Curated annotation (Swiss-Prot):
<feature type="site" description="Stabilizes the basic form of H active site to accept a proton">
    <location>
        <position position="91"/>
    </location>
</feature>
<feature type="binding site">
    <location>
        <position position="14"/>
    </location>
    <ligand>
        <name>tRNA</name>
    </ligand>
</feature>
<keyword id="KW-0694">RNA-binding</keyword>
<dbReference type="GO" id="GO:0006515">
    <property type="term" value="P:protein quality control for misfolded or incompletely synthesized proteins"/>
</dbReference>
<keyword id="KW-0963">Cytoplasm</keyword>
<feature type="binding site">
    <location>
        <position position="64"/>
    </location>
    <ligand>
        <name>tRNA</name>
    </ligand>
</feature>
<comment type="similarity">
    <text>Belongs to the PTH family.</text>
</comment>
<comment type="subunit">
    <text>Monomer.</text>
</comment>
<dbReference type="GO" id="GO:0072344">
    <property type="term" value="P:rescue of stalled ribosome"/>
</dbReference>
<feature type="binding site">
    <location>
        <position position="66"/>
    </location>
    <ligand>
        <name>tRNA</name>
    </ligand>
</feature>
<feature type="site" description="Discriminates between blocked and unblocked aminoacyl-tRNA">
    <location>
        <position position="9"/>
    </location>
</feature>
<comment type="function">
    <text>Hydrolyzes ribosome-free peptidyl-tRNAs (with 1 or more amino acids incorporated), which drop off the ribosome during protein synthesis, or as a result of ribosome stalling.</text>
</comment>
<dbReference type="InterPro" id="IPR036416">
    <property type="entry name" value="Pept_tRNA_hydro_sf"/>
</dbReference>
<dbReference type="GO" id="GO:0000049">
    <property type="term" value="F:tRNA binding"/>
</dbReference>
<keyword id="KW-0820">tRNA-binding</keyword>
<feature type="binding site">
    <location>
        <position position="112"/>
    </location>
    <ligand>
        <name>tRNA</name>
    </ligand>
</feature>
<dbReference type="GO" id="GO:0005737">
    <property type="term" value="C:cytoplasm"/>
</dbReference>
Amino acid sequence: MQLWVGLGNPGPQYALHRHNVGFMALDTIAEVHNFGPVQKKFQGWLQEGRIGTEKVLLLKPATFMNESGRSVGEAMRFYKLGMDALVVFHDELDLAPFKVKVKQGGGTAGHNGLRSIDKHLGPDFLRVRLGIGHPGHKDRVTGHVLGNFAKSEQDDLVDMLGAIASEAALLAKGDNVLFMNNIALRQQTAG
């Protein structure tokens, strides 16, 4: 069993923020792979399903970004999962918009959701980094991250989310390189 976590902030006012792209990814995966109904558990929203041959739990912490680790830690302990079962989808400033990279472990790069998970569980988890691009100057980062995707970005966002969901079976079976490559190819074809 794997636990896939999407990072974001709860509430409709945050739904289209770049910071919520982790939530968006999980919503798309759940829809494409016909996951079960949403259950309120572990201080978040949980859905159960299968991706390929793997049982996968999708968790969107409802704790706000800065406390995501509480929710994730609770689920990990309940299901007695090791760190190798955890995959976290999050926004990444240091990647070009709509690029997808998978990384094992590492630092938090100032991301409060990652920092919270690291604090509660340690840094050794798989991250699916979803590029939102950098606004160019550090003074503009907060507004960029907490801003909505622009209308002009919607097609690229939908393409990225669809590619992630379509290729999710590769991620579930641990073929991270092919997962990334196939997403990039789908995006080239769509663009």
